[in-house]
Regions:
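Secondary-structure boundary/capping positions in well-ordered alpha/beta enzyme cores
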Residues: 83, 118, 122, 149, ...
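Walker A/P-loop
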Residues: 118-140, 149-152
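Short, hydrophobic/aromatic alpha-helical segments in well-folded domains
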Residues: 107-110, 138, 150, 323
Length: 335
């Protein structure tokens, strides 16, 4: 009833429990005599229809018994449905040093409170809601309260000057450092990074591409790459032990090879003692404008065909990830 001529019901149930869509492959030899897997769309469609029947059958069975239904509902609510997102109230915040001609709206004050008290924060307001002022006000309050030493704002390259103007519009007496295109030319980069590291600035504003030119220390990069290799090695071993699809195993092996090559390249680099690393800047708060530019970060998962989960990785995304991990370490998840 729940199997096909190409795959039995037990295997379909196993794939379903592992959050995988069933796929049926035929194997052919290419011109070089290598065995190649080709998706059989017809058999896959039949198998996936059986998979949906199993899911629906399980769902019908779960809810058929009133006692079981009540018990499972209670367990689910106690374990997963008992957390209510915290609401933040910023009505009490004074905003010392803010331009008296400007008054933040209620949602902006609450967003600042969220940043102050809630740790890592995503500002997902609509365009025009005032996210720039929210970040600027939060940065100044963090500094005033002694909760941060120096904030770094990473914004689209063409908006650095606009950001600086809006920052000073909201806080006219703020001491900020703004990067220009010349500051990150090879001959000037070390001097500018030195200014960031030694200056007592309220905030530093740089462009996305400039941010990528400030490296993490080789030791930290190596540790993170080694951790990724370890995760991929475990994933490959698990798939082989469970007789996972050859395609999935090859995909992980390609990812492992790519990360291993990155590690080898990193180990071959000659250390440049005159390079100022990100850790040496003294930055302990990071504000990213237009953060959706940093997508396609590799994530190991058993799930397949999930929108938004990339199997390849953008260099700028992995660079930001490393820097965020470092800031979380030194701030307790508030970087």
């Amino acid at each position: 009833t729940y199997g096909t001529s190409r795959i039995n019901a037990y295997k379909i149930i196993e794939e379903t429990l592992n959050l995988k869509d069933v796929r049926i492959f035929d194997y052919i030899e290419d011109d070089e005599g290598k065995r190649k897997a080709v998706l059989n769309k017809k058999e896959t469609a039949i198998a996936q229809a059986k998979q949906e029947l199993i899911k629906q059958g399980f769902q019908d069975w779960v809810w058929a018994d009133p006692e079981r239904r009540e018990k499972l509902t209670r367990l689910y609510n106690e374990k997963f449905n008992s957390i209510r997102p915290r609401e933040y109230d910023g009505s009490h915040i004074i905003f010392s040093g803010m331009n008296p001609e400007i008054t933040l709206r209620e949602h902006q004050r609450n967003a600042v409170a969220h940043i102050l008290y809630g740790g890592n924060t995503l500002l997902a307001h609509a365009v025009g809601a005032g996210k720039t002022f929210e970040m600027v006000a939060a940065s100044q309050e963090l500094k005033r309260l002694g909760l941060c030493n120096k904030s770094l704002f990473v914004v689209p390259n063409h908006l650095t000057e606009q950001w600086a103007a809006e920052y000073l519009q909201l806080y006219p007496s703020a001491n900020i450092l703004v990067a220009t295109k010349k500051d990150f030319e090879t001959k000037n980069r070390k001097r500018f990074c030195g200014r960031i590291a030694t200056g007592d600035y309220d905030a530093v504003i740089i462009g996305h591409s400039q941010f990528e030119k400030i490296p993490m220390s080789i030791e930290r990069q190596r540790a993170i790459l080694e951790q990724q290799i370890e995760e991929l090695t475990r994933g490959i071993a698990e798939l082989k032990a469970n007789r996972g699809e050859r395609f999935s195993i090859k995909q992980l092996e390609r990812s492992k090879k790519s990360v291993t090559q990155k590690l080898a390249k990193l180990n071959d680099q000659s250390r440049k003692d005159d390079v100022v690393t990100f850790e040496e800047l003294g930055v302990d708060r990071l504000f990213i404008d237009e953060s959706h530019y940093y997508k396609n970060l590799y994530l190991y998962t058993k799930m397949r065909n999930v929108g938004g989960i990339a199997q390849t990785e953008a260099q700028k995304s992995s660079d930001l990830f490393m820097k965020c991990r470092y800031l979380d370490e030194i701030t307790g998840g508030r970087g």
